[in-house]
Amino acid sequence: AVYTLPELPYDYSALEPYISGEIMELHHDKHHKAYVDGANTALDKLAEARDKADFGAINKLEKDLAFNLAGHVNHSVFWKNMAPKGSAPERPTDELGAAIDEFFGSFDNMKAQFTAAATGIQGSGWASLVWDPLGKRINTLQFYDHQNNLPAGSIPLLQLDMWEHAFYLQYKNVKGDYVKSWWNVVNWDDVALRFSEARVA
């Protein structure tokens, strides 16, 4: 298999009480695994199509690959973007903190904009803080499903899963409470590392 399911960098219950261990186990072991399997299956079927010179299903196969691979990428970032409360800084500092101040005016402004983007998603999607290498700036984005609405080249720094499977067992349909709780477990060390790497990519 080309793609494999990464291990979580902490125990299922490590993010409690903000995100329950039950959610984390289902989310990682079932949902994320399904995207990994789906991406590998799409690659296999594309290889079969090449061997047979039969591309009648190319549109479906390309969509399947994009959807599942994006789901795998997003979740792989999402897990590392979080850490048990108290194990990482509560807000960004140094170069990332300065960049957020530059592009949003303040950390609180960025947090408010990101929260609005997350809670405003209609249906399933992601809120993301990204580095735009063309504009040399940080933006907030809403992804629909896993890949739609994403400008090519944007590099995710901070990802928040707004699919119902990420919160419904604990927060029901109250997205705002989920997002408010999630801020407590953001791993700003990981976000800062992604920012440093993205700027020189």
Swiss-Prot record:
Superkingdom field: Bacteria
Gene Ontology MF annotations: metal ion binding; superoxide dismutase activity
Pfam families from the UniProt entry: Sod_Fe_C, Sod_Fe_N
Enzyme Commission number(s): 1.15.1.1
Regulation: Shows decreasing activity with increasing pH. Slightly inhibited by azide and fluoride at pH 7-8; the inhibition is drastically increased towards lower pH.
Binding of Fe(3+), residues: 27, 75, 161, 165
Family: Belongs to the iron/manganese superoxide dismutase family.
Known partners and oligomeric status: Homotetramer.
Protein name: Superoxide dismutase [Mn/Fe]
Lineage: Bacteria, Bacillati, Actinomycetota, Actinomycetes, Propionibacteriales
Name of the coding gene: sodA
